[in-house]
């Protein structure tokens, strides 16, 4: 069945495999998450569960979130996310999902918000080569021509231009789980994931994993 968790990126480190290989890993605090709501195909047209992560005081949340969580009979959470599942009837409102739902060797997709880098030029944002760095030229890091004049008399959509870099939703697919610490709700993922330290991430079964 499909499964997932909300987590928090704690940072990167490295571990050694049994054969001596050094493996770069990202440590994620995955859960515990509480099932707040169920959605079924009969009632809502699709099967999903809504989970909450990072409990907080009711005074720090708005009334809509407090009322929604109170209906579920659970505490108030800072983050609520919906996860598609094959069969929502396998879950009950109030169930606690922890890191132990995953196992070493599982392939997962991790979604997070990339680190924002502000307004950047085309060389940093898109990898343009740029002009000559020598003297006698005033064309160094400029984008150059962005289109023709009379025809088509416009700039095409999706033209690579300077602008905001980062701070967008990014998903990294098929990351392998190296180790699971169920006692501390920690998952070690092989490689890097988007976002800064303490950033919110969503961990789900990989859509491209071999069945």
Swiss-Prot record:
PROSITE patterns: RIBOSOMAL_L3 (PS00474). Coiled coil: none annotated. GO terms for molecular function: rRNA binding; structural constituent of ribosome. Disulfide bonds: none annotated. GO terms for cellular component: cytosolic large ribosomal subunit. Pfam families: Ribosomal_L3 (PF00297). Keywords: Ribonucleoprotein, Ribosomal protein, RNA-binding, rRNA-binding. The keyword Signal does not apply. Gene3D superfamilies: 3.30.160.810, Translation factors. GO terms for biological process: translation. One of the primary rRNA binding proteins, it binds directly near the 3'-end of the 23S rRNA, where it nucleates assembly of the 50S subunit. Belongs to the universal ribosomal protein uL3 family. Part of the 50S ribosomal subunit. Forms a cluster with proteins L14 and L19. HAMAP family: Ribosomal_uL3_B. This is Large ribosomal subunit protein uL3. It comes from Geotalea uraniireducens (strain Rf4). The lineage of its organism: Bacteria, Pseudomonadati, Thermodesulfobacteriota, Desulfuromonadia, Geobacterales.
């Amino acid at each position: 069945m499909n499964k997932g968790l909300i987590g928090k990126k704690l940072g990167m480190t490295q571990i050694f495999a049994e054969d001596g290989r050094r493996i770069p890993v990202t440590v994620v605090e995955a859960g515990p998450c509480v099932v707040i709501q169920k959605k079924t195909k009969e009632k809502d047209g699709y099967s999903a569960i809504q989970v909450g992560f990072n409990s907080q005081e009711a005074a720090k949340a708005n009334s809509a979130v407090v009322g929604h969580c109170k209906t579920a009979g659970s505490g108030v959470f800072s983050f609520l996310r919906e996860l598609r599942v094959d069969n929502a009837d396998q879950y009950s409102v109030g169930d606690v999902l922890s890191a132990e739902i995953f196992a070493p060797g599982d392939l997962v997709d991790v979604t997070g918000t990339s680190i924002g880098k502000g307004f950047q030029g085309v060389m940093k944002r898109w990898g343009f080569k740029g002009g000559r760095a020598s003297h006698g030229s005033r064309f160094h890091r400029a984008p150059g021509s962005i289109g023709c004049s009379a025809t088509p008399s416009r700039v095409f959509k999706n033209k690579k231009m300077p602008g905001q870099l980062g701070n967008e939703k990014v998903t990294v697919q098929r990351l392998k789980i190296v180790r699971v610490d169920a006692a501390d709700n920690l998952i070690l993922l092989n490689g890097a994931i988007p976002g800064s330290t303490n950033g919110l991430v969503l961990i789900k079964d990989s859509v491209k994993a071999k069945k």
